[in-house]
Amino acid sequence: MRRSSGFGGQKGQGPSCSFTGCWCCRGDDVAESDDSPFAQCGYNIQEKHLGKLHRAASRGEVSKVECILSSGSADLDERDKKKRTALHLACANGHPEVVALLVDRGCQLDVFDNKNRTALLKAVQCQEEECATILLEHGADPDLPDVYGNTTLHYAIYNEDIPMTKKLLLHHANIESANKDELTPFLLAVHEQKQQMEDFLRKQKENLTAVKLESIHQVMSEYKENETPRNPQNSNPEGTSNKMACLGEGAAGAKVDEIPGNPVKRLFNKPSIDDSRPMSANEDFDFDTEEKATEPANGKRQNGMGIIESAPQEHTNNENI
């Protein structure tokens, strides 16, 4: 497993900073050449590469941003050469007033930069909670992963940012989302030895499990209540009355034969010797077989059974001789 190592800076900063409160003006080839997901928080920016809207947004110049948008001289969701929007730069540099303006103007919230990071993810990564809050309250998705598979929760955990983590969880961020190293936010905390975050997440998972169990119990209770059988005496009143009528007839002396479809009749109504109903050959054979145990020993029969039946008399005559 590749270790996702890196270094974080203070809020809104990396190792150094010389551009309006951010460390992002040292050249595009400095930190972004490091492929580690946690090697940098902000953007490396050269002003000459920015359009006027991006430049004003990255500096936090609210009135200038509004003027540019009102004049129609720039597209609200315009991208720079690294696919960043003005919203990305405002979030990374911590300008909530610009973020609010762009959102009110209807900008797209979940646009990806060249590393598949949304403006919300950049706000979380750079620990800009106010910017992140605006985006979350307007429906930004906290679970969209970047090229490393990390979501907003992974970066909040790595930064040991408990307030941001709480806010993300309140907006239903997925605590079980795994990155490309197969690390969930909790496993990332363990892997990076973030003990405070590990304890916090363990507590959150316990609370989440308790809530889930309570919901399951409630659902099961409602299911059992809906599936409880009604009183059998009332479940089929018509069928019950018919059964009672049959029982009443039996009590009044009705013959068993008179009850239609009576199973007792089917089981015990065997044909007798005096039965005048014509019998098939198979029925006659079955009858003889069943009755042989009850035939008298001296009874003569016109079939093979008669030979066995007359044997005792022949034996008696031999004794007399």
From Swiss-Prot:
Keywords: ANK repeat, Repeat. Residues 229-242 have a biased composition (Polar residues). Transmembrane segments: none annotated. Residues 222-242, 268-321 are annotated as: Disordered. Disulfide bonds: none annotated. The keyword Ribosomal protein does not apply. ANK repeats lie at residues 48-78, 82-111, 115-144, 148-177, 181-210. It comes from the Eukaryota. Pfam families: Ank, Ank_2. The keyword Repeat applies. This is Putative ankyrin repeat domain-containing protein 26-like protein. It comes from Homo sapiens.
